[in-house]
């Protein structure tokens, strides 16, 4: 990308806008929360050099997280739009501000976003609405494993769990809801100064050097391969269709389950390290999670899944070539199964 007079004008526009918000702060001592998000973007308009394609994918990723299926089978906004770290409110605001300098959010993106949700109604009532009929909108303090009835039955009766190498999820054949490079995470460093100077490569403040793309230096952080088991932290009614599931196991005591799982793995790998808990979702354009390992960090496009995972780190010689099962014993004392009629 080459710097231009048009980009100069945009940079001036953002500086002037930031100055107006700053003047309001000086006069009143505060701003409404949404204006703080706007002020934040005016100070650092990190999407200013991004391509329309980059912005479009970012828009669809946030849209995918800001809608849900209700127990009645209706599409509704997520109630946790402003999550505990305030990710999606600012993200949405910054996108609409940048699109505002480009003529507004393209209508095709609105249409594509609607299509993503309409797929749940392709066969009539969404599978998750039928599967969780009679359940409340949400269930707190549980983890939920989605899958085929025969596998969920084995998990309930025998505690049969399938452990998967992280490399498995890179397969192109997997659905978008499942496919991810689990041992890699990207961070996008704005490169305004380098682009304005006419450079096509630049270094980050941490010393990483790379090509400039979409106005960013895109750095990939990697970790060694590992094995994992995943579940969700709610009875989200989108999940059954996303994972082609006709059944689910609702585990009411995640800590007890994790303890049994760890004991089972220790029999296989006595000295193996294990990490258990909820996934932290991150924005590649933010560096809040820059120093965290990829194993419990995922791109915000997956945040609606509210994933809980158990990761274990066998040595290279112990690393399995493919997924395998272990049995933990019956889980009927800490879990219940729901399934579509057979």
Please give the residue ranges for each predicted region.
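NAD-dependent ADP-ribosyltransferases
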Residues: 1-342
């Amino acid at each position: 990308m080459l710097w231009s007079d048009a980009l100069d004008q945009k940079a001036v526009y953002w500086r002037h806008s930031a100055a107006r918000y700053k003047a309001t702060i000086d006069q009143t001592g505060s701003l409404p929360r949404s204006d703080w998000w706007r002020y934040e973007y005016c100070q650092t308009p990190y999407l200013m050099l991004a391509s329309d394609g980059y912005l479009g994918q970012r828009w669809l990723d946030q849209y995918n997280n800001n809608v849900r299926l209700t127990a009645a089978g209706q599409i509704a906004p997520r109630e946790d739009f402003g999550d505990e770290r305030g990710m999606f409110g600012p993200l949405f605001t910054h996108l609409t501000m940048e699109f505002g300098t480009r003529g507004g959010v393209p209508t095709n993106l609105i249409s594509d976003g609607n299509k993503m949700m309409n797929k749940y109604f392709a066969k009539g009532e969404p599978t998750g609405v039928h599967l969780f009929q009679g359940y409340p909108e949400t269930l707190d303090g549980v983890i939920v494993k989605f899958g085929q009835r025969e596998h969920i039955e084995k998990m309930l009766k025998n505690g049969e769990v399938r452990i998967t190498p992280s490399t498995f999820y890179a397969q192109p054949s997997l659905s978008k809801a499942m496919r991810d490079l689990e041992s890699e995470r990207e961070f996008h460093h704005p490169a305004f100064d380098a682009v304005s100077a006419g450079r096509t490569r630049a270094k980050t403040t941490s010393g990483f050097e790379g090509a400039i793309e979409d106005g960013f230096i895109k750095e990939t952080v990697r970790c060694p391969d590992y094995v994992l088991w995943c579940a969700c932290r709610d009875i989200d009614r989108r999940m059954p269709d996303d994972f082609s599931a006709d059944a689910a196991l609702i585990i009411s005591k995640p800590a007890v389950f994790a303890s049994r799982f760890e004991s089972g793995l220790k029999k296989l790998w006595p000295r193996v390290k294990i990490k258990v808990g909820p996934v932290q979702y991150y924005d590649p354009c933010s560096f809040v999670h820059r120093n965290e390992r990829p194993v419990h960090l995922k791109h915000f496009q997956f945040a609606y899944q509210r994933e809980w995972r158990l990761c274990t780190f066998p040595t290279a010689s112990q690393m399995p070539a493919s997924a395998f099962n272990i049995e933990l014993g019956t889980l009927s004392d800490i879990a219940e199964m729901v399934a579509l009629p057979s």
